[in-house]
Curated annotation (Swiss-Prot):
Entry-linked PANTHER family: NAD(P)H-QUINONE OXIDOREDUCTASE SUBUNIT 6, CHLOROPLASTIC (PTHR48479:SF1)
Catalytic class of the enzyme: translocase
Name listed for the protein in its UniProt record: NAD(P)H-quinone oxidoreductase subunit 6, chloroplastic
Record's bilayer topology term: Multi-pass membrane protein
Domain of life: Eukaryota
Length: 176
C-alpha cells in the first residue's frame, strides 16, 4: 500500500500504541476477562501491521485465527475455569429447555437425513468453461477465495458448522 509518509507514520504509531496499551492491560488488569480482551486488542493491532506491507491475506488470516479463534478460546477457558459465583444451584430442566433440545434434535436429524439422501456424485460443482482464470492477473488471496468458494466449498462449510457446534457447546459449558 503506497501511503504518504505522515499517514504511514501515524498508522504505525497508532498500532504500536495499541499494542503497548493492550500489553499493559494484559499484565496489569486483575480481572482475567479484561486481560483476555486486552490480548485481543494486541492481536488485532499485530494483524493490522501487515496491511501497510500489502499482505492483506496474512492480515485477514491472523485476524480470523488469532482474534477470532484463539482469543475466544482463551476467554471461554477463563470463563469455564473461574466458575460462576452467581449460579451455583442445581439446574432443573424447564419447558424451554425441552423445547430447545427438541428443536435442535429435529434440525440435526433433518440435516443428517438430507446429507445421507443427497447424491453427491451427481452434483456438478463447477465447470472450467465458466471459470476464466488468468493466473497472472489474479492475486494469491483471490485464488484462495476462488478455491474456497468452488473446489473446497463443502469441506469449508462442514468445518464452519463443526466450529459453530463447538462454540455453542463451549458457551453452554461456560454458563454452568
Amino acid at each position: 500500500m503506497d501511503l504518504p509518509g505522515p499517514i504511514h507514520d501515524f498508522l504505525l504509531v497508532f498500532l504500536g500504541s495499541g499494542i503497548i496499551l493492550g500489553g499493559l492491560g494484559v499484565v496489569l488488569l486483575t480481572n482475567p476477562i479484561f486481560s483476555a480482551f486486552s490480548l485481543g486488542l494486541v492481536l488485532f493491532c499485530i494483524s493490522l501491521f501487515h496491511i501497510p506491507s500489502n499482505s492483506h491475506f496474512v492480515a485477514a488470516a491472523q485476524l480470523l485465527i488469532y482474534v477470532g479463534a484463539i482469543n475466544v478460546l482463551i476467554i471461554f477457558a477463563v470463563m469455564f475455569t473461574n466458575g460462576s459465583e452467581y449460579y451455583n444451584d442445581f439446574h432443573v430442566w424447564t419447558v424451554g429447555d425441552g423445547v430447545t433440545s427438541l428443536v435442535c434434535t429435529s434440525i440435526f436429524v433433518s440435516l443428517i437425513t438430507t446429507i445421507l439422501d443427497t447424491s453427491w456424485y451427481g452434483i456438478i460443482w463447477t465447470t472450467r468453461s465458466n471459470q476464466i482464470i488468468e493466473q497472472d492477473l489474479i492475486s494469491n488471496g483471490q485464488q484462495i477465495g476462488i478455491h474456497l468458494s468452488t473446489d473446497f466449498f463443502l469441506p469449508f462449510e462442514l468445518v464452519s458448522i463443526i466450529l459453530l457446534v463447538a462454540l455453542i457447546g463451549a458457551i453452554a459449558m461456560a454458563r454452568q
